[in-house]
């Protein structure tokens, strides 16, 4: 889920989510895998990643959350005035979600749109080349989008800082196996 916020609202939304949203939700309505604020690319956004055992479980838990009085009476009234729009992607992982070995990272979420019928072959090729790519940095997860943006693949990378990201990407681009991919 991606929220696009009014300019300047990120700190308020982050604090509200940390202090109130997490207290209400915990992992009782889906497991929170990550929560990020954008600083490069589309600005004024908060991206959060939730995992569920199935689409049916997601629907059931979202229904239960919508009946939670604290969610609807306390959290949403503080969030909604800051929200301009939201985007929801339903994604299936083909590289399992895994937390990075260290904290305090910057994250890069890359999304690509494939031609119709080409997303699954691309994802398989990407999964196959992952051992080569992970010689340089570990992938935090990769997904095929089922809804929101069909024919889209997203993957997430953690780096200690932007300089390390630039250096890592430069090394990856020099790898002959990666170049073949």
What are these regions (language model features)?
Residues 1-180:
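Short S/T/G/P-rich N-terminal loop/turn motif that feeds into the first structured element of a domain
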